[in-house]
């Protein structure tokens, strides 16, 4: 697997970090993913790109899993270290990003916001809203990067616990909205059903499951 140099390893919360590396010369489309690992470990994991697809580097939003085979090793790398990066792969991409008539709703949980951060950075002129389900305030990763009003988070821990399904049940979604879902499987199943019941056609729904 090709190796690239680590440029930065930025801690975002207690368990989540942003890994910045050199990028391959391949054409990359926002929403695609890469297999990433530590050389010599024999294991890697698929991560969605977090950065602008046109940037001179790659960024990955990674949650460190206790006892995991890949994320703890990546959490320990430092600038100058090599990491294995293979890709890009995947088709979880915007089909017509130049169509200014479209409204997008990006719904995600945890680090599932990664492809949507990439969409927003790569296509700054699209009209979008992000609905981000997190546990705590410190998991609102780089929320200040989005235009005012474009980012909404719901916290499952705290004084008034809420999840994205609760939010959607109390807010109307225009059936013409193009909706992308990224996160855990149960969230995607539940949200898909809510949106279909609200009249959003299946052709307007795109999903990516984060394991």
Annotated model-derived regions:
Residues 69-211:
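FNR/FR-type flavoprotein reductase catalytic core
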Residues 2-81, 86:
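Ferredoxin-reductase
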């Amino acid at each position: 697997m090709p190796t690239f140099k680590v440029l930065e390893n930025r801690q975002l919360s207690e368990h989540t970090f942003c890994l910045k590396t050199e990028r391959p010369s391949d054409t990359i489309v926002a929403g695609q993913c890469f297999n990433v690992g530590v050389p010599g470990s024999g294991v890697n994991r698929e991560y969605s790109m977090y950065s602008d697809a046109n940037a001179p580097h790659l960024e990955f939003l990674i949650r460190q899993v206790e006892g995991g085979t890949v994320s703890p090793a990546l959490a320990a790398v430092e600038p100058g270290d090599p990491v294995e990066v293979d890709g890009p792969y995947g088709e979880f991409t915007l089909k017509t990003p130049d169509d200014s008539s479209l409204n997008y709703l990006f719904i995600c949980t945890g680090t599932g916001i990664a492809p949507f951060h990439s969409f927003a950075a790569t296509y700054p002129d699209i009209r979008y809203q992000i609905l981000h389900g997190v546990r705590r305030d410190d998991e609102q990763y780089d929320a200040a990067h989005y235009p005012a009003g474009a980012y909404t988070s719901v916290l499952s821990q705290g004084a008034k616990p809420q999840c994205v399904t609760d939010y959607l049940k109390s807010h109307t979604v225009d059936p013409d909205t193009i909706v992308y879902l990224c996160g855990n499987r149960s969230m995607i199943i539940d949200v898909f059903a809510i949106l279909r019941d609200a009249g959003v056609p299946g052709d307007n729904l795109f999903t990516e499951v984060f394991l």
